[in-house]
């Protein structure tokens, strides 16, 4: 099968997409996976490093207020729709999976309009604008938190999946991690992170 995966801008969209891609590869060695992102997004560095085929579209985030940037973003959106159509026609995916971020908007939308099975995954309790818009067109909306269900208008499409996690996080060698980070296992450690 051919899988087109898209999502980007931040690690919060990219790493779950890569987790999904890697799990597909683990379960189906013959799967063909294409990741679509933007040239300027973090995905342009991370995806090729993971060994996946990577293509780009032209698209920018839509400003919340109407201004000069809104018109530039609209132009880029139309270019992104055209780029997405071309990539979909060339790759011929069996399924398209989006993990959020403005880049997945044109890709998932074009795939849905071509009647290709489409899924989106929302990693946050409060869904992003792109996924809320796309939920109208896709076949399934996968959510991490039950609380986010109330923000989507199509409850029949929702599947609670949790958040995809990279195997290297799950299968970590704790002793080696302490050594690599030069941390004593006998000293309390506080980790703080966020997005």
Role assignments for model-derived ranges:
Residues 1, 173-192:
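Nucleotide-sugar donor-binding and catalytic loop/hinge architecture
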Residues 83-96, 104-119, 132-136, 140:
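Glycosyltransferases and closely related glycan-assembly transferases
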Residues 3-7, 30-81, 161-164:
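Conserved nucleotide-sugar phosphate-binding/catalytic loop shared by glycosyltransferases and other
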Residues 12, 47, 100, 125, ...:
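Residue-level signature of catalytic and energy-coupling elements of molecular machines
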Residues 7-10, 99-101, 192-195:
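Glycine-rich beta-strand-to-loop/alpha-helix junction loops that act as flexible
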Residues 5, 34, 42, 53, ...:
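Active-site-proximal region of nucleotide-activated glycan assembly enzymes
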Residues 13-24:
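Short amphipathic alpha-helix
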Residues 72-89, 172-176:
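Glycine-rich, highly charged phosphate/nucleotide-binding loops
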């Amino acid at each position: 099968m051919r899988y087109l995966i898209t999502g980007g801008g931040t690690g919060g969209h990219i790493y779950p997409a890569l987790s999904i891609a890697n799990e597909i590869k683990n379960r189906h060695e013959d799967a063909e996976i294409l990741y679509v992102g933007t040239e300027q997004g973090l995905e342009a560095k991370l995806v090729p490093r993971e060994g996946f085929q990577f293509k780009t579209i032209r698209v920018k985030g839509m400003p919340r207020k109407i201004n000069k940037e809104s018109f530039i973003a609209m132009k880029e959106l139309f270019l992104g729709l055209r780029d997405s159509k071309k990539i979909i026609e060339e790759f011929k995916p069996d399924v398209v999976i989006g993990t959020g971020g403005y880049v997945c908007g044109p890709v998932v939308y074009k795939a849905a309009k071509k009647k290709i099975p489409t899924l989106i995954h929302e990693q946050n309790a409060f869904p992003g604008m792109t996924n809320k818009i796309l939920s109208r067109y896709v076949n399934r909306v996968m959510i991490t938190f039950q609380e986010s269900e109330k923000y989507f208008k199509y409850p029949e499409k929702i599947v609670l999946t949790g958040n995809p996690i990279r195997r290297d996080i799950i299968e970590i060698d704790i002793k080696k991690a302490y050594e690599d980070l030069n941390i004593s296992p006998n000293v309390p450690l506080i980790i703080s992170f966020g997005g």
